[in-house]
Curated annotation (Swiss-Prot):
It is an enzyme of class 3 (hydrolase). GO terms for molecular function: metal ion binding; N-acetylmuramoyl-L-alanine amidase activity. InterPro entries: Bact_Sporulation_Assoc, MurNAc-LAA_cat, N-acetylmuramoyl-L-ala_amidase, SH3-like_bac-type. This is Putative N-acetylmuramoyl-L-alanine amidase YrvJ. It is found in: Secreted, Cell wall. The keyword Signal applies. Keywords: Cell wall, Cell wall biogenesis/degradation, Hydrolase, Metal-binding, Secreted, Signal, Zinc. Probably involved in cell-wall metabolism. Residues 95-108, 160-169 have a biased composition (Low complexity). Its main location: secreted. Residues 1-27 form the signal peptide. GO terms for cellular component: extracellular region.
Length: 518
């Protein structure tokens, strides 16, 4: 009998010793990335449990286990705690480690500041010098969280390049410059020099007004320049160029007394009258120039190549007449209040993503890939018009509905636009539909935007309707959800995927937002 009791006690001790080991082995289930500004960590899976810690946006913690809408995480202190699942982004541990090992950025700014959060309002915690490399931890709407010299912080994505360091000279070596160079003078207060001929390229340095430089080559509205031994690319319409020595460039530039309007953003609308509701006569490309023949409020009257008169908003052009009058960026020399989108915070929400493919089109294409295409094009146009734009997902990742709404609240959005495409079992169904939830808060936004889109769209108008969608119902900010066509309809699927349609609907949404904010 005593021997049996002894064996039983040994078994109990052995089993007890196994439990912690078993728990730690099965614990790893990826990482939780905090998706809201601040979040409470609780001692158990529910709001009734006590708060034990607080975590901040962008921080990462190993996931231990899940219980309904709650996730248990491993804190850095060795403690464990529970957080709500809809305020985190889950990342697979394998993909996180593989991307982390190769995803690096290089600073292109000699004085790039690291901040405690993704925005200029956050505290400066250090510097990321030009040429230095760092590992990427997270990304958020134009900001990148990096690990640099054992410190972590956020830097603006505008001043870093992906991967190893590259310089403008590396880029320029691949360009065949013409033998005949010209001299030029910077005609704006601050001119970005970029690593390649693109507005998406990294900024290498900035040049002040009046800086003399050599123009080596020009292509597609960009000038390949050299200044003080540094080579790079600048938008050519910001330069006053001449084949005479640089000292005489101001005189050469003043030979034309007619004041010109230089288009700063691709796809700028030229209208029949001085109003965003006026019909569009023509769309101008970035760098196009027109003679200014008059003004009307905050609009310039311009003369088109065919002799016709049109109007362009003065906040989307640069004007120049001589070196002394080379136009400032429009925000700085436009009167206060010009441009209804200026400084408006707009959330662009591409529906679905990651494991959520959305609907599947007639040809088998996923909705999630089309929504982000539309969202990125729209965001680019809204930024060009002066808006502060945040996109809820930048790539093919899953973002919860709660996180999308949380972004709207956190950014105190002036407007939230959720982009979707529709489908139906009856493949003859087609058309675009704008949805709102609150008549008082949302309906005007949906109506203004939809009215401008249908002017440009070639597909049927299904109207502005009430929609009980989470991103509308739970959103405290003005919000709309846009179904921009039926991908279950074979012809309409081809239409909505076309570049022409994408340009038209994003133009319409931009114009509708301008109308809404007037």
């Amino acid at each position: 009998m005593n021997k049996k009791y002894f064996v039983l006690i040994v078994c109990i001790i052995f089993t007890s010793a196994l439990f912690p080991t078993f728990s730690s082995v099965t614990a790893a289930q990826g990482e939780a990335v905090i998706a809201t500004d601040e979040m409470n960590v609780r001692s158990g899976p529910g709001l009734s449990y006590g708060i034990t810690a607080e975590v901040k946006k962008g921080e990462r913690y190993p996931i231990l286990k899940e219980d309904g809408d709650w996730v248990q995480i491993q804190l850095g202190s060795g403690e464990k705690g529970w957080v709500v699942s809809w305020l985190i982004t889950k990342e697979d541990q394998a993909s996180t480690s593989s991307s982390g090992s190769s995803d690096t950025v290089t600073s292109t700014d000699p004085d790039l500041r690291m901040r405690s959060g993704p925005g200029t309002s956050y505290e400066v915690i250090g510097k990321f010098p030009q040429g230095s490399q760092a590992s990427v931890i997270d990304k958020d709407s134009g900001w990148i969280k990096i690990s640099y010299h054992s410190a972590t912080g956020w830097v603006s994505s505008e001043y870093v390049t992906s991967g190893g360091s590259s310089s403008a000279s590396d880029e320029s070596d691949q360009t065949e410059d013409s033998g005949a160079s010209t001299t030029g003078t910077v005609g704006v207060s601050s001119l970005n020099v970029r690593a390649s001929a693109s507005h998406d390229a990294a900024i290498i340095t900035k040049l002040d007004r009046g800086t003399k430089l050599t123009v080596l080559n020009e292509k597609n509205g960009w000038a390949h320049i050299e200044v003080n031994g540094l080579k790079g690319w600048v938008a050519s319409h910001y330069l006053l160029t001449s084949s005479v020595p640089a000292d005489d460039s101001a005189n050469a530039g003043s030979s034309s007394s007619a004041k010109k309007a230089y288009i700063m953003y691709g796809g700028t609308n030229l209208r029949s009258d001085a109003s965003t509701s006026a019909s569009i006569v023509e769309r101008a490309a970035k760098g196009d120039s027109y003679t200014i023949t008059g003004s009307k409020g905050s609009w310039y009257e311009i003369k088109l190549d065919n002799g016709q008169t049109a109007y362009v908003a003065n906040w989307v052009v640069q004007t120049s007449k001589s070196a002394e009058e080379a136009g400032e960026p429009p925000v700085s020399d436009s009167p206060s209040g010009n441009g209804s989108l200026n400084n408006k915070t707009i959330i662009v929400d591409p529906g679905h993503g990651g494991k959520d493919s959305g609907t599947i089109g007639y040809s088998g294409k996923f909705e999630k890939n089309l929504t982000i295409k539309t969202a990125k094009l729209l965001a680019s146009k809204l930024r060009s018009a002066g808006a502060d734009v945040y996109v809820t997902r930048q790539d093919d990742t899953f973002v919860s509905l709660q996180s999308r709404v949380s972004t709207s609240h956190y950014r105190n959005a002036d407007a939230f636009i959720s982009i979707h495409y529709d489908s139906y079992a009856d493949t003859s169904t087609r058309g675009s539909t704008a949805y709102y939830y609150s008549p008082a808060k949302d309906q005007e936004l949906a109506s203004d935007v939809h009215s401008e889109v249908v002017k440009r769209s070639s597909i049927p108008d299904r109207g502005v309707l009430f929609g009980d969608y989470y991103v509308l119902r739970e959103n405290r900010q003005p919000a709309m959800l846009y179904e921009l066509g039926y991908v279950s309809h074979p012809q309409e699927e081809a239409i909505v995927h076309s570049n022409s349609y994408q340009e038209k609907v994003t133009d319409g949404i931009e114009s509708g937002l301008e109308k809404y904010f007037q």
